[in-house]
Amino acid sequence: MEALINEFYRCDIIQHGEFTLKSGEKSNFYIDCRKIFQYPNLMRMVCDEINKKIINSDWICGIPDGATPFATTVGLMRNIPLLMLRKEKKEYGMKRQIEGNY
């Protein structure tokens, strides 16, 4: 885990300063997870850690949009299907909020 944190700093993913989070709370650091996608080796390291935490699963689904690449990668690693969650239910076509056979 220490190697992963060091890579976060090396790739400028952990920022220090004054930040307002989505919740409105203030923080003196920020982890910009969307930058992880730019670094394949780091993406693999993060997904390896996520994979270790999953005990048993028939499907995987990431919270849109930021977690979808992580879910996709872990799904490929584990050979399990990915469910695609939409932020909002579609009002056309099949009108689904979740795409996939579950």
Protein language model features and the residues they cover:
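Conserved hydrophobic/aromatic pocket- or pore-lining residues that grip, position, or stack substrates
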Residues: 24, 60, 82
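Anionic group-transfer/hydrolysis microenvironments
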Residues: 34, 64, 88
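Short glycine-rich phosphate-binding loop at a beta-alpha junction
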Residues: 57-64
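Conserved SAM/SAH-binding loop
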Residues: 67
